[in-house]
Amino acid sequence: MTNSKARYVLEPVQVTGTTFALNGTTLSYQFHVDEPSADLRSDHFGGSISGPIPVDPEPIVDGWTGMPDRVRREFPDQGRGDFRVPAFRIRQAEGHTVSAFRYREHEIVPGKEVSASGLPGVFGDAHDATTLIVRLVDPYSDLAAELKYTVFPKYDTVVRSASITNKSNSDVTIESLASLSVDFPFDELEMIGLRGDWAREAHRLRRKVDYGVQSFGSTTGFSSHLHNPFVALVHPSTTESQGEAWGFSLIYSGSFTINVEKSSQGLTRVSIGPSQLSWTLKPGETFDSPECVAVYSSTGIGGMSRSLHGLYRKHLMKSKFATEDRPVLLNSWEGLYFHIDQDRMYRLAQEAAALGVKLLVMDDGWFGDEHPRTSDDAGLGDWIPNPARFPDGLTPLVNRITALKVANSQRNMRFGIWVEPEMVNPRSTLYQQHPDWVLHAGNYPRTEQRNQLVLNMSLPEVQEFIISAMSEILNAADITYVKWDHNRGLAETPSPCANHAYMLGAYRVFDVLTTRFPNVIWEGCASGGGRFDPGILQYFPQVWTSDDSDAVERIFIQFGTSLAYPASAMGGHISSVPNHQTGRTTPLTFRAHVAMMCGSFGLELDPAHLTDSERRDIPGLIALAEKISPIVVKGDLWRLALPEDSNWPAALFLSENRTQGVLFFFQLAPMVNHSLPRVRLQGLEDGALYRVDGEGPYSGSMLMNLGLQYSFRGDYGSRLAFIERE
């Protein structure tokens, strides 16, 4: 949360006449109904204010007073004089895209339930949240709109969504519908996004908001590696710990668009929502947008991130594992790739158990009968164990593995598998039987990527097949972990609305399976972090953050990902060196410390290739990871120094009650003839006393204002310090 000591005293939702105020700990979000036009006008989104807000004086230019593109609007339309990016575009039966929604009524509802529309969303009871529903009508077209605002005061957060209902007698087409559109009166802002590609996701990009529209998003059918459905607005002077920051995060896993527009008048508009819609809305039907989370922070970018992290852990992620420690795992992929069978997997499990690993994950290569999955060009869709590799099926192997005792533990080994149910290889029995189940556009060639095609998740028969196939696997053996992959984008979509329909079908499958198997740890993956978004976190409590397991690259990726997402949702592994993606060699401890910054910690290697010293050191590193895991999973994060700005990136996790902490401090490259690097902590109490790895006690003021010095030697140094309040 933004300020752990602050207490909100205003009602979360206050209505005075037709002025609406949403209040948080340090947040005010206000808008009103313009009396002449019944249009919703934005007043303020920022720090707490009280009392009336003066109406903005309209600029006076001969003949142009009162033009719609010169005022701040809450639900801006298209075609009636506002030439900025609209919040929606509806093609009417007559062919035009003119709409005129006017305020009709409002309702205040305690709490917030997950949407019944099939989309993921936040939830909370009356103590956590209050929802304002504003209803609008277009008297010329018989269309109705609802804008929903849920305020979570503790997190200085407003969650917005929109819906359109067709009350006319003709079809209309929803060509776009933003989940949120907000106008700021400021003209000197900067925007921060997360850009990247495969194996280099979530790299920060901070740039000036200049005149015109700056737009980014995804057209791949999933949120993608290229851009994340998140953007922050900040003042040029805002830092990690000081200044105002606004964060916008879309609860959606499909194609999306974020527009940041600075108008000729110096107003700044942010709109965010799904893209590639073109959704036909028949009479009596309603179309719902995804939800967008809007966070305000008066304590810098770090405060914004902590609000998002807390909200997502408590009010978005439904899995019980969202706030529980995850077992240390070993994934077979980089150790064995496709070269797996029952003997190799049992040998891997034995060696993992001897190291103290609690969970063995069998990655790709275990399935396919007539088309064995011995490479990536066959087998997807045929979810039965390969009889040549697993002649007795999975159940006996799983029973043998789960009977293994883990060294230095009272627990037995657990077992997990990799799947990619949304895909199919042309070389598979499933495709031969159901070629019509894949996305395709008439007679056009079906584009393969990674030798695979995409199943049409909007089809009920496809959904039922996946639910049945996955349920059969999980019912047949004691499998307690599933890594769910998604390795390509959507192509040859059969209709303009197919991308959104695909996501609705996928969400239904996720919901059914995670509800049916609540004791399974579900991990999302899309060639790494290609679908790391709030929508997926509703169902899967963790995501494989990147296919790049190089520790140096992972520092940038994990620091970037933490801008919007909690460490509890990240997966990080110790892999072998030289690293398989970069060829870089880094020390074991450095690799381990980087991976420990994730809620799911593990190894991705073949233990048979470990050196004697690595074999001796890994059990202690596993024990350390398990010791700090409750703080990383449940605690709050302070990014003390960013890898983009410093040779010594650092981060601090503090427990919820602020009595324990873990400091991560890294050196990327040596610096000759230079004073020892110093790190100043944050989030402590000035007058409290703390011990650092047992030394001290030191005052919180000393640790925050002077800090600690550590010595490093050579490339890729790391320090992990345990902090405890007396």
Swiss-Prot record:
Positions of glycan attachment: 23, 166, 456, 657, 673
| Chief site of localization | secreted
Sorted alphabetically, the Gene Ontology cellular component annotations on this record are: extracellular region
User: A GO biological process this protein is involved in?
Assistant: polysaccharide catabolic process
Q: Where in the cell is it found?
A: Secreted
**Gene3D superfamilies membership:** Aldolase class I (3.20.20.70), alpha-galactosidase from lactobacil brevis (2.70.98.60), Golgi alpha-mannosidase II (2.60.40.1180)
User: Single GO molecular-function term?
Assistant: alpha-galactosidase activity
| Active-site residue numbers | 485, 547
Q: Is Ribosomal protein included in the keywords of this UniProt record?
A: no
Q: What is its EC number?
A: 3.2.1.22
The first-level EC class reads hydrolase
Catalysed reactions, semicolon-separated: Hydrolysis of terminal, non-reducing alpha-D-galactose residues in alpha-D-galactosides, including galactose oligosaccharides, galactomannans and galactolipids
* Disulfide bond among keywords: no
Q: Could you tell me which PANTHER family the record lists for this protein?
A: ALPHA-GALACTOSIDASE C-RELATED, GLYCOSIDASE FAMILY 31
Q: Family assignment?
A: Belongs to the glycosyl hydrolase 36 family.
What is said about its interaction partners and assembly? Homotetramer.
The protein's name is Probable alpha-galactosidase G
Organism of origin = Emericella nidulans (strain FGSC A4 / ATCC 38163 / CBS 112.46 / NRRL 194 / M139) (Aspergillus nidulans)
